[in-house]
Amino acid sequence: MAASMCDVFSFCVGVAGRARVSVEVRFVSSAKGKGLFATQLIRKGETIFVERPLVAAQFLWNALYRYRACDHCLRALEKAEENAQRLTGKPGQVLPHPELCTVRKDLHQNCPHCQVMYCSAECRLAATEQYHQVLCPGPSQDDPLHPLNKLQEAWRSIHYPPETASIMLMARMVATVKQAKDKDRWIRLFSQFCNKTANEEEEIVHKLLGDKFKGQLELLRRLFTEALYEEAVSQWFTPDGFRSLFALVGTNGQGIGTSSLSQWVHACDTLELKPQDREQLDAFIDQLYKDIEAATGEFLNCEGSGLFVLQSCCNHSCVPNAETSFPENNFLLHVTALEDIKPGEEICISYLDCCQRERSRHSRHKILRENYLFVCSCPKCLAEADEPNVTSEEEEEEEEEEEGEPEDAELGDEMTDV
């Protein structure tokens, strides 16, 4: 049951009409599936579309470690200065230009029943209307025996940082269908994401859960069923259906990163200052990030993932002509042209980060094959086809380090810094 073209564009915001006239979804091949193509000239730097996800959820360990985000849109809730104080471990850390912080605490609201926090009344209402009535634990928020808490604890015991997925993304899918008046529409939307064979699904689940994935998957399925069973999507609760749902989230979940501190830094970059003042501010920010790295390491953002209908139609290229980002400090995904895109040209993003894209063809293929189960045939890979299938010594060392990390360390789309 495929989603209609109308459904594909229905989660675009702001420039939704623009997206409908500037791009179209086409079938490419049995290997690639769908693709997104320009129908008119798109200029470099132009926003091609802005899209909100069908569902999104913060990663569970990220939330447990006090990365405070709106429970609906993932907007960072800490003031930039509070964020800096927590990440540096310095309660007295003060930021200059506090007026540049965009966080509005006066607008924050919590659920009156379970106390989860939202950035605004609009987000609280949107969550309540879409899925939160089903998922709200009420006064049992901290009860370890509540079915949802048992499910989340089981997930945390299996999927450690760096996180790439969340069982709560799947929970919000079910809860959305449960609450929906038009259940068939939501089932159509979720079913349009790419499907894998049984063997491919097992590879994805293995990547997420590790060597004991079969037993762990069955434990999660049992807890998931106990907490959320819904007759309208009963197939999602069977062993095969749950594995498919898991694989759907593992391959289609787009990483989301938000940070009030990053927003403040970007605002500082736009200030018109005297050269000496600019030098002082830049030096302050450089030192701030050094202090954060020493205290916190690489985990700077509120992190989660979401399912985006139109963005999921964008195929990968190692030389992308578009990129994804989250400049609004929430779950609204912007796809922006990196170069002029001609009518009829496919719009491609990269599933690899900047460093990975600079590695050898062999290394790029290894990452893509392990995480997305395809072999890239973009212009860069075709041009390098005659290169030997070897990695440099530096890349081999990096791969050895990665093999020492949790097996899920690289799964998922690039989390774009804000």
From Swiss-Prot:
Reaction(s) catalysed by this chain's protein: L-lysyl-[protein] + 3 S-adenosyl-L-methionine = N(6),N(6),N(6)-trimethyl-L-lysyl-[protein] + 3 S-adenosyl-L-homocysteine + 3 H(+); L-lysyl(20)-[histone H4] + 3 S-adenosyl-L-methionine = N(6),N(6),N(6)-trimethyl-L-lysyl(20)-[histone H4] + 3 S-adenosyl-L-homocysteine + 3 H(+); L-lysyl(36)-[histone H3] + 3 S-adenosyl-L-methionine = N(6),N(6),N(6)-trimethyl-L-lysyl(36)-[histone H3] + 3 S-adenosyl-L-homocysteine + 3 H(+)
Zinc finger (MYND-type): 98-136
PROSITE patterns for the chain: SET
Xref: SMART domains: SET
GO biological process: methylation; negative regulation of gene expression, epigenetic; positive regulation of cytoplasmic translational elongation; regulation of stem cell differentiation; regulation of stem cell division; transposable element silencing by heterochromatin formation
Up-regulation conditions: Strongly up-regulated in gastric adenocarcinomas and hepatocellular carcinomas, driving malignant progression.
Annotated S-adenosyl-L-methionine binding sites: 351
Gene3D superfamilies: 1.10.220.160, 6.10.140.2220, SET domain
Chief place of localization: cytoplasm
Consequence of substituting residue 351 to A: Abolished trimethylation of 'Lys-22' of the RPL40/eL40 subunit of the 60S ribosome
Cystine pairs: none
Family listed: Belongs to the class V-like SAM-binding methyltransferase superfamily.
PANTHER family: HISTONE-LYSINE N-TRIMETHYLTRANSFERASE SMYD5, SET AND MYND DOMAIN-CONTAINING PROTEIN 5
Quaternary context: Interacts with the N-CoR complex. Interacts with EHMT2 and CBX5.
Any further remark recorded for this protein: Acts as a strong promoter of malignant progression of gastric adenocarcinoma and hepatocellular carcinoma via its ability to mediate trimethylation of 'Lys-22' of the RPL40/eL40 subunit of the 60S ribosome and increase protein synthesis. SMYD5 inhibition significantly decreases cancer progression, and renders cancer cells hypersensitive to inhibitors of PI3K and mTOR.
Entry protein name: Protein-lysine N-trimethyltransferase SMYD5
Species for this entry: Homo sapiens
Name of the gene: SMYD5
